[in-house]
C-alpha cells in the first residue's frame, strides 16, 4: 500500500497527527481537540472496516485529527493564509483552507488529504474517499452536540 502521493511513507506531520499529536500551529481548545480525536478515531475505524491497510488507516485518522486545527483561530488571522478564492467566504469556514495551506507549507503533498481538510466544512464534488468520509464523520461523530432535528431517526 502506498500513500496517495505515491510514496510508501506518510509525511512526518501526517504520521504524528495519526497518533494524536497536533501540529505546533494548532489553535484549538480542549473540547475542540476532543472532537478532533473522536473524528480521527471514527475515520480510523471506517478505514479499518474497509480493510484499507495501515497506511490508509493512518491517513484517514490524520484527516480527522487535523481538520479543525485552526477552528479556534481568529478569522482575520486566517485570511492572509488562504487562497484568494476563499477571501469572500464567511470567517467560520476559513479554518479548513488555512490549515491545508499551513500543511502544504510544511511539505505535505497528499492532494486528497489536503483537499479533504480544505473543504470539510462545505463539501466538494472533487472529494476522494477520505474527503467524503471526513465530511460525514465531522457531522456524525458521537460526541457532536447537534440539535436532534439534524440527526436521522
Outline where the language-model segments fall.
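Catalytic cores of the polymerase beta-like nucleotidyltransferase superfamily
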Residues: 5-9, 49
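Generic N-terminal amphipathic, Lys/Arg-enriched alpha-helix
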Residues: 9-29
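Alpha-helical protein-protein interaction elements
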Residues: 14-17, 38, 52, 59
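Divalent metal-dependent catalytic cores for phosphoryl transfer on phosphate-bearing substrates
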Residues: 22-27, 34, 44, 49-153
Amino acid at each position: 500500500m502506498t500513500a496517495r502521493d505515491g510514496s510508501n511513507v506518510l509525511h512526518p506531520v501526517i504520521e504524528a497527527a495519526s497518533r494524536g499529536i497536533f501540529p505546533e500551529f494548532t489553535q484549538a481548545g480542549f473540547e475542540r481537540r476532543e472532537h478532533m480525536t473522536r473524528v480521527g478515531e471514527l475515520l480510523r475505524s471506517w478505514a479499518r472496516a474497509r480493510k484499507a491497510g495501515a497506511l490508509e488507516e493512518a491517513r484517514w485518522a490524520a484527516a480527522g485529527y487535523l481538520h479543525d486545527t485552526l477552528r479556534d483561530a481568529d478569522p482575520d488571522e486566517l485570511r492572509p493564509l488562504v487562497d484568494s478564492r476563499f477571501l469572500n467566504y464567511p470567517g467560520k469556514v476559513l479554518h479548513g483552507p488555512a490549515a491545508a495551506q499551513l500543511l502544504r507549507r510544511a511539505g505535505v503533498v497528499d492532494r486528497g488529504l489536503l483537499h479533504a481538510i480544505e473543504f470539510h466544512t462545505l463539501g466538494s464534488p472533487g472529494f476522494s474517499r477520505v474527503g467524503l468520509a471526513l465530511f460525514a464523520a465531522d457531522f456524525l461523530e458521537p460526541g457532536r452536540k447537534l440539535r436532534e432535528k439534524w440527526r436521522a431517526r
